[in-house]
Amino acid sequence: MNPRAKGYRNEMKAQKILEAAGYLVIKKVHTKYSPGDFFEIYDLIAHNENGWRCVQVKTNRRETPELREKIEMFPVSPGTTREVWVFYDRVSEPVIHVI
């Protein structure tokens, strides 16, 4: 299985889950010449009347210590959560870690 395709598919799953929960979801388009993530950290940014969710989507493993440090150091406003969603193979729902 192509790892890039698997990651993209999991990002789309996360986007659909958030949209079904009433969030407006923004996803940055991956191109050859620009970084694929918001602030080189987040795959998705979601918003509803309750606040913002900044989401990093991973497949089969947690974030690296370096990425976790970047996430923790990134300033966010009150009402914003920083999350890592991990999709494991053959498991329908992601494991959501709020940082």
Question: What residue ranges belong to the model's regions?
Answer:
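Catalytic phosphate/metal-binding cores of nucleic-acid and nucleotide-processing enzymes, i.e., regions
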Residues: 1-99
